[in-house]
């Protein structure tokens, strides 16, 4: 009876793996399309604005990421990746906010440190009125980042499923020598 349960579990795991592989291929196809679309839109923007107007010389001297990739442990030790906007988790300020010496005579305001809550949009590096194709390129690459994180999570789930499949096959081989 244990062999029948093991075979049923093996069958369900194989079906899950096949579904995950099909989903992985679909997401990879969409990712390739998004990246291709992004590069094509970037080429259109370079054509519209001029080759020298869209290039590395317009990049900011100090760049900050707009998104971060967070890895978290899900069920059964699987790692899941998630794309999170960079402004969501701001580091906390440590230390005194006020100056060391204060004048007691009058209420004077101490200047508050400037905090950039939202990171600057990189499209502003190329001017105020940028072509629509440059915005399309940014959106395509942003979608590609999300898809890449989903693909990495899915690939981890597939690897975990393959290791589970091998383990179940070994158990079945021990229960029924000559089968499997």
Curated annotation (Swiss-Prot):
Superkingdom per UniProt: Eukaryota
Localization in the cell: Endosome; Lysosome; Endoplasmic reticulum-Golgi intermediate compartment; Cytoplasmic vesicle, COPI-coated vesicle
A Pfam family it matches: Vma22_CCDC115
Regions crossing the membrane: none
BP-aspect Gene Ontology terms: cellular response to increased oxygen levels; intracellular iron ion homeostasis; lysosomal lumen acidification; lysosomal protein catabolic process; vacuolar proton-transporting V-type ATPase complex assembly
Function recorded in the entry: Accessory component of the proton-transporting vacuolar (V)-ATPase protein pump involved in intracellular iron homeostasis. In aerobic conditions, required for intracellular iron homeostasis, thus triggering the activity of Fe(2+) prolyl hydroxylase (PHD) enzymes, and leading to HIF1A hydroxylation and subsequent proteasomal degradation. Necessary for endolysosomal acidification and lysosomal degradation. May be involved in Golgi homeostasis.
Annotated protein name in UniProt: Vacuolar ATPase assembly protein VMA22
Organism of this sequence: Homo sapiens
Lineage: Eukaryota, Metazoa, Chordata, Craniata, Vertebrata
């Amino acid at each position: 009876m244990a062999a029948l349960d093991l075979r049923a579990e093996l069958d369900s795991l194989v079906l899950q793996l096949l579904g995950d592989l099909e989903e992985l291929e679909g997401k990879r196809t969409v990712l390739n399309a998004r990246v291709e679309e992004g590069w094509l839109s970037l080429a259109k923007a370079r054509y519209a604005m001029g080759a020298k107007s869209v290039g590395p010389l317009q990049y900011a001297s100090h760049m900050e990421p707009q998104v971060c990739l967070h890895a978290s442990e899900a069920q059964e030790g699987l790692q899941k990746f998630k794309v999170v906007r960079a402004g969501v988790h701001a580091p906390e300020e440590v230390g005194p906010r006020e100056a060391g010496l204060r004048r007691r005579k009058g209420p004077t305001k101490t200047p508050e440190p400037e905090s950039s809550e939202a990171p600057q949009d990189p499209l502003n590096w190329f001017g105020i009125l940028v072509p629509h194709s440059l915005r399309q390129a940014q959106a395509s690459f942003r979608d590609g980042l999300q898809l890449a994180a989903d693909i990495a999570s899915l690939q981890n789930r597939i690897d975990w499923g393959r290791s589970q499949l091998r383990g179940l096959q070994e158990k079945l081989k021990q229960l029924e020598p000559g089968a499997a």
